[in-house]
Amino acid sequence: TTVMWDYKSMKPIKIFNTPGAALEARWSFKPGDNWAVTTTALTSNIYVYKQDDKGEWQQHNVGTIGDPSKIPLPVDIALNSDGKSMWINTFMDGMTRLWDMSDPLHPKETYTKKIGNQVNMVSPSFDGKRVYYTTSLVSNWDQKNQANDQFLKAYNWDGKELKLAFEIDFLKEKLGRAHHMKFQARDLKTLQPLQASTTAKVNVVSN
């Protein structure tokens, strides 16, 4: 299931039947937008949540990621700050996919790239020109032996192609497993740039 909450009253607004294990949910930050999106790990679907003409929230199955029969396992998703596109990572095949979300009820896949043997988290910069990836999902589920990629990779995005900027091999550096990232360049309450005295940074947490 997917549950939409009213954070002011701390009560659920609506409970949706979302088969296939929805993992991450994201809201569009584009001014004027009022929709959210999730993906399902086991069925490789994209679901969008929007209000209908009566103000009732509805769930829409709007897309399929990869070949569901092979269980690519969609894990992390990240909407770009303009709300026009979304990165989707699939863990089992190590792929990242860019979807055009300018019409959220009719999204289209526009780009794919293999990041490694496995890939988990994705975090685009607020200007959309850089994209960061880490690889570990859960230690017991990560690939084994030579396929056990544990890295942070940073790419530059020119609108057409991801080009590797740098990478950190967590196994080589004895840093553990590269799981979660937090990229911060703006105040998340106002979406305004942080003060010049505070530099933008990437925090990486290993699990």
Language-model features: locations:
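Predominantly soluble domains enriched in secretory-pathway, periplasmic, or organellar proteins
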Residues: 1-207
